[in-house]
């Protein structure tokens, strides 16, 4: 791939969008049942192993608006992958629970997902991946600071 003659910051900024678009197209063809954005919401919900997250918890972790995440959660609920339950400690609060159908989807795709990740990061050293994670976390912190200015 031939890169334009820009400084690294501008190249990286543009590459974020390009990779995001390519991953969305590839991801949407990966699953028959769900979109890649729906998959990401499921992954985020799954990280809350010990307790069910609220919509706000998921929206914050996804990095999207409450309204956008609610639309995705509603679609996943309609498809039977999620269930909305009341918080037993605060009946005003709704929590998101993965269903057995969702857990089956995860099991059915586990091997295919592992193969996808292996192919996606083929030829990339562990040290390089660690550096990318550090840079992404730093960028995330910078974005939060910029939002609060």
Model-derived features: where do they sit?
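N-terminal leader segment of winged-helix/HTH proteins
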Residues: 1-32, 79-81
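C-terminal regulatory/oligomerization modules of transcriptional regulators
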Residues: 1-4, 127-149
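N-terminal positioning helix adjacent to the helix-turn-helix/winged-helix DNA-binding module
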Residues: 8, 37-38, 101, 128
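Hydrophobic structural patches
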Residues: 16, 42-45, 136
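Alpha-helical linker/hinge and terminal dimerization helices associated
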Residues: 16-19, 23-27, 62, 105, ...
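N-terminal helix-turn-helix DNA-binding core of bacterial DNA-binding proteins
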Residues: 24-65
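Charged, amphipathic alpha-helical coiled-coil/dimerization segments
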Residues: 74-133
């Amino acid at each position: 791939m031939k890169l334009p003659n820009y400084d690294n910051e501008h190249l990286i900024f543009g590459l974020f969008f390009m990779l995001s678009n390519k991953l969305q197209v590839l991801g949407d063809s990966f699953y028959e049942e769900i979109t890649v954005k729906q998959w990401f919401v499921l992954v985020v919900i799954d990280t809350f192993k010990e307790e069910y997250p609220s919509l706000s918890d998921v929206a914050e972790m996804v990095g999207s608006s409450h309204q956008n995440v609610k639309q995705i959660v509603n679609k996943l609920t309609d498809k039977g992958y999620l269930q909305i339950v009341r918080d037993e400690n605060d009946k005003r609060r709704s929590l998101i629970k993965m269903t057995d159908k969702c857990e089956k989807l995860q099991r059915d795709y586990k091997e295919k997902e592992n193969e996808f990740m292996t192919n996606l990061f083929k030829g990339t050293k562990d040290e390089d991946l660690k550096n990318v994670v550090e840079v992404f976390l730093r960028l995330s912190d910078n974005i939060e600071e910029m939002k609060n200015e």
